[in-house]
Amino acid sequence: MAKFLREKPSNFKFSLHDAKIIDIDYDYGENRLIFKTQSGFIDIERNEMVDGEIILEGVSWEDSYVYIMEYKNVLTGNVGSFIGEKMYLSNFVDAFYSKFGSFDVMSEYDSYMTYMLSGFLKRGSEELEANIEIFYNGDIIYNVRG
């Protein structure tokens, strides 16, 4: 039996862990998605926050989804019952500015043509849990200010 090892990528320079996304912009013509943060994101090598925005290119809108979970009788993020909704990423982006206040990133995952964010979504005074699953075939660009 042949054994193949899948190595973990070692070239991650930035992390969105603890980033607060306050706006999401998109360009359907160019299939680009832009995450704008309140305080930036982590520069892993320097272990500090840097200001900027994140751009995903080659987004497939019909293959990208957002899962929103509203917990019942338990604090958001804990084990327990919830009700939820799965929606197209495009519908979520259209509603983000008017319906949601921000998205606090807890973790991110980048794999072959799939980029996922999980965290907590603000809706008024409510905290919801959300997973954003983006199918893409382009680059991830970190525009760093300063």
Regions found by a protein language model. Name each.
Residues 1-146:
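Surface-exposed, interaction-prone regions used to assemble/regulate multi-protein complexes
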